[in-house]
Amino acid sequence: MNRKKGDKGFESPRPYKLTHQVVCINNINFQRKSVVGFVELTIFPTVANLNRIKLNSKQCRIYRVRINDLEAAFIYNDPTLEVCHSESKQRNLNYFSNAYAAAVSAVDPDAGNGELCIKVPSELWKHVDELKVLKIHINFSLDQPKGGLHFVVPSVEGSMAERGAHVFSCGYQNSTRFWFPCVDSYSELCTWKLEFTVDAAMVAVSNGDLVETVYTHDMRKKTFHYMLTIPTAASNISLAIGPFEILVDPYMHEVTHFCLPQLLPLLKHTTSYIHEVFEFYEEILTCRYPYSCFKTVFIDEAYVEVAAYASMSIFSTNLLHSAMIIDETPLTRRCLAQALAQQFFGCFISRMSWSDEWVLKGISGYIYGLWMKKTFGVNEYHHWIKEELDKIVAYELKTGGVLLHPIFGGGKEKDNPASHLHFSIKHPHTLSWEYYTMFQCKAHLVMRLIENRISMEFMLQVFNKLLSLASTASSQKFQSHMWSQMLVSTYGFLKSISNVSGKDIQPLIKQWLDQSGVVKFYGSFAFNRKRNVLELEIKQDYTSPGTQKYVGPLKVTVQELDGSFNHTLQIEENSLKHDIPCHSKSRRNKKKKIPLMNGEEVDMDLSAMEADSPLLWIRIDPDMSVLRKVEFEQADFMWQYELRYERDVVAQQESILALEKFPTPASRLALTDILEQEQCFYRVRMSACFCLAKIANSMVSTWTGPPAMKSLFTRMFCCKTCPNIVKTNNFMSFQSYFLQKTMPVAMALLRDVHNLCPKEVLTFILDLIKYNDNRKNKFSDNYYRAEMIDALANSVTPAVSVNNEVRTLDNLNPDVRLILEEITRFLNMEKLLPSYRHTITVSCLRAIRVLQKNGHVPSDASLFKSYAEYGHFVDIRIAALEAVVDYTKVDRSYEELQWLLNMIQTDPVPYVRHKILNMLTKNPPFTKNMESPLCNEALVDQLWKLMNSGTAHDWRLRCGAVDLYFTLFGLSRPSCLPLPELGLVLNLKEKKAVLNPTIIPEAGVGNQFSSSQDEEEVDMDTVHDSQAFISHHLNMLERPSTPGLSKYRPHHHHHHHEHKKKKKKHKHKHKHKHKHDSKDKDREPFAFSSPASGRSVRSPSLSD
């Protein structure tokens, strides 16, 4: 962006420097969902001829702008409100993505742009030439905001405080412009004064220190005054207002927690742990928490579970739990720890540009991982790393790669570093949400690779150095260059690494930062007895999408009879075969213990081994020091030894996965041994349950004895005297609790020779439910009971229909009747005694959908639609919507698809709207290569309109709509559309115009919006309309002139008049009102309604 290689300092893209901002919201109306207030920005011009100031502001109605108390004219133009002209017949995604990327760049603060352009009054020009301070005062209001601020107003009786009404800021990446005018960039830091006037019964929580709370004379309202003296980006400013209950942390008085009424006991328990997280981070970073206070606010209808802002974090209220809940506790603690890690890197230390985002996400994810290792142990940490690695590998192979450090400009290729994607990665607001999630995942994994290279000690020293520099800078009064120490850049971070460690990590950076893709290894081996050598063959696939070629060191661990040996191979360009000398001679007769990797010595039964080979098992890249997928071939007995005796949980998980392909009595025995071993990591034992079920099904004809796991379960959890009755619940040992609730779910997957669930298993599960007794247990059994319902659902197999008879409740299969009765009983009980997070209702809804899909009960979406309505708990709604999405796909129901699309547009909860798009993308009703009755012109238009103008208030939602459009129709024009008339196409990649019958002019999108300095020539007092501007440029193509920006420039003025002439023809809905004569124009701001007024997005019209 603004950073050339080797460039040290930060150069602002703006011709001024912001030093302080005041935000004052003096009226909040919960009834109307409106906000009124003003902002005041203190700026220092950095160039002499500053006559235009660009700021960010979306959906705010701007009433008046004054600079140093003089009225200033301003223009509001937001091309992202409607990306492509509504008249346009374009329907191909390539065109949209280019236009959208251009629209976002046109208002991108990191390119010095903004939606609001203010003209500096001529009286101040001399003042500006002397680079003296300017104070910009903007009065604004927000009416029923669709993004940025979220109002939750329960429709019950009582005052707003009694109803628990609250409002909070939210959004994806830099979204502060949605609720007040600002420079919405992570690189523009300033100090803040924040004031909020609310009803006396409400509490306003914001960033920084609460300086004072002042009541009005009538005591009906009060104003909260916050000061944030640490320079902070507007994007890290937040707000939450509601009738919160307040808890000062008993261990750390500078920490305060807020929750909605009646939840204080849960808040006390949930946050009782947070001081330990503080202590951990301060200790490893050898640096104090950077702010003077920290606030946690738990709110309803959260945008994301955790949102970190300067000195405060906003959490979902669903994370709160009591001491009786087991499963939620680690999840909530992880959320708290993530939020705190981001306080240091993300809020306190910000980024220079979007291409440096990976550093912040990487460091915060990495130190969060260290916290996890300390809190949950090394096994859990390794399991998490493996899980994250599998996720990123699967995503990159599916989509073609995630690029951590996209550098723009320069060479042709670099301009579009992600041509395999259907969206631009040049800007956070054009990214698919899933891509961004995977981006964060890859960032922390790469940080771990850097740690492997330079050591943890050096890594923490680098972080400490970054924090110390930032800390020194933050305490300085405003000096133009000091605060840039609080911004991290890729260059600065890498330089710091080489200074501290003295190591060259350039190859690693080149491999994982500057290119996308993961590595795919295929390994096999042969033992050469004569030479006593292991001949290892390692192949790579670097031609498939999402892969890259790896050259460098690769660790291989070989467990032999005499111990475990590590070898480092050098993977060269073409080398495939590697000879590794063996240390042990092949097996001797004398009985001897075998030393393992961790120094332990164990007795093994070696009868399964090959007589002339000393090899027990082999592992490639055991430390996961390459982002890779490994497919390794070794004999079944080697996997069995590895599962039993290798102490690394990742190796055990990998062997379990491999053993699915070897359904033999020996595999069965190895898995059963693991299930019985109490020292074994609980997640490995849980995986073993499911693997054992798969193996049992493959061996069904030769299986002897009771169904898999049944006797084991009986021995562990049932009464000695009466084996079919389960003991009273006692969940004191969490390991056995997780095993107890997983085993029945896995057993329900067992099938007999006729591919039905054995009657014995079903009876066993029904007995577990019937005799479940939680009276003496100090923990809740809601998750356990929910898993029992999942087990019932797993036992269901497809219905066999006789003479196409219609299924009714009278002719139900007797087993299915039992299952349905249990589900109904559970659902009714839930209405009387709801479980924590309604886990049981969620499982029941999923089970009913399974019965429908298997043809046991009539397929119908109405039950799910009633549960999906606003007002139900969010987990229930998501489960119900999942079922409706599935029904839409299976039954090809246009009606339900319309119902879902309607919900995406009208549902009050942003998270639910996002989830519906997400579920439709993951389980689409049809895809681009399918013929489907659902695919028609009306649907194309509807989705096009949704992403073009219907989601302008929420970046995440718009990118979700783009993902869905891509899944359904692909990149080019949807196949179900009629062929358009002959048209001229400008092929951007080839840079030539061609005639094409299938596509309407795909004009030079890059030229639609321009952010270059030449724009200053535009007459500010003529209303500047982006849509007209674009349509004019499209018309230019019909003329013989070469499409180049310079050629377009002279037409600026002329296009306004041309547009007026054409207005009737186009039926535009723009209204331009010039209230004042030309004399007054300079002084008075003109009234003007935004280009997109009257369209589907409520746009901020500007008036006096």
Swiss-Prot record:
Keyword flag Nucleus: yes
Extent of Polar residues compositional bias: 1090-1104
Gene Ontology cellular component list: nucleus; transcription factor TFIID complex; transcription factor TFTC complex
Primary localisation category: nucleus
SUPFAM superfamilies documented for this protein: ARM repeat (SSF48371), Leukotriene A4 hydrolase N-terminal domain (SSF63737), Metalloproteases ('zincins'), catalytic domain (SSF55486)
Modified residues (Phosphoserine): 1090, 1093, 1099, 1101, 1103
Compositional bias of kind Basic residues: 1048-1076
Quaternary structure, from the entry: Component of the TFIID basal transcription factor complex, composed of TATA-box-binding protein TBP, and a number of TBP-associated factors (TAFs), including TAF1, TAF2, TAF3, TAF4, TAF5, TAF6, TAF7, TAF8, TAF9, TAF10, TAF11, TAF12 and TAF13. Interacts with TAF2C1. Component of the TFTC-HAT complex.
Similarity comment: Belongs to the TAF2 family.
Function: The TFIID basal transcription factor complex plays a major role in the initiation of RNA polymerase II (Pol II)-dependent transcription. TFIID recognizes and binds promoters with or without a TATA box via its subunit TBP, a TATA-box-binding protein, and promotes assembly of the pre-initiation complex (PIC). The TFIID complex consists of TBP and TBP-associated factors (TAFs), including TAF1, TAF2, TAF3, TAF4, TAF5, TAF6, TAF7, TAF8, TAF9, TAF10, TAF11, TAF12 and TAF13. TAF2 forms a promoter DNA binding subcomplex of TFIID, together with TAF7 and TAF1.
Name of protein: Transcription initiation factor TFIID subunit 2
Organism encoding this protein: Mus musculus (Mouse)
Species classification: Eukaryota, Metazoa, Chordata, Craniata, Vertebrata
